[in-house]
């Protein structure tokens, strides 16, 4: 369907996830931009199409945040200072548009969880963010069966890491 934002949103989300899962599993932080960038570029094209159809949409800004994070993962040392602030700005916009979007808190929690403390990370803050996302999932229902609902399994996983 070429006239609705959701197909472009989901296609962009899938590109980000494919790019994330294509990254080296050895934890290396070298230049992996040849892996990450094609996925990020395609995701950006798709999410921009979604944004043309649905402006001021919290879900779209969550995916924009994910795209900037994927680019940063592609070459963290070279891109942290450029993609990091863009990712943060997209997430802040997502929260401003809908503070009850659990995906905002999942993404924020993941950042806090994986960032070393000396750079602003905090497992304690991450736990609170995952618990907030979980609370929103427990008390809200999507408007339709095709609206974004992802994130419950991530919340369950991360909360289990604190037991």
Residue ranges and their predicted role:
Residues 59-65, 98-104:
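A structural motif
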Residues 1-10, 14:
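N-terminal leader/linker segments that initiate helical-solenoid repeat arrays
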Residues 2-3, 52-55, 99-100, 138:
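Short coil turns that delineate tetratricopeptide repeat
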């Amino acid at each position: 369907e070429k006239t609705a934002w959701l197909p472009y949103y989901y296609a962009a989300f899938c590109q980000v996830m494919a790019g994330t899962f294509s990254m080296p599993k050895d934890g290396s932080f070298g230049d992996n931009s040849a892996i990450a960038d094609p996925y990020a570029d395609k995701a950006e094209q798709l999410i921009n199409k979604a944004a043309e159809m649905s402006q001021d949409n919290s879900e779209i800004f969550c995916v924009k945040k994910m795209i900037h994070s994927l680019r940063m993962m592609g070459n963290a040392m070279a891109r942290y200072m450029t993609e990091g602030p863009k990712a943060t700005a997209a997430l802040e916009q997502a929260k401003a548009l809908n503070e009850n979007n659990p995906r905002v808190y999942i993404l924020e929690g993941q950042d806090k969880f994986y960032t070393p403390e000396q750079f602003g990370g905090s497992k304690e803050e991450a736990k609170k963010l995952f618990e907030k996302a979980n609370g929103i999932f427990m008390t809200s229902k999507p408007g339709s069966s095709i609206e974004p609902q992802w994130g419950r399994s991530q919340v369950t996983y991360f909360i289990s890491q604190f037991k």
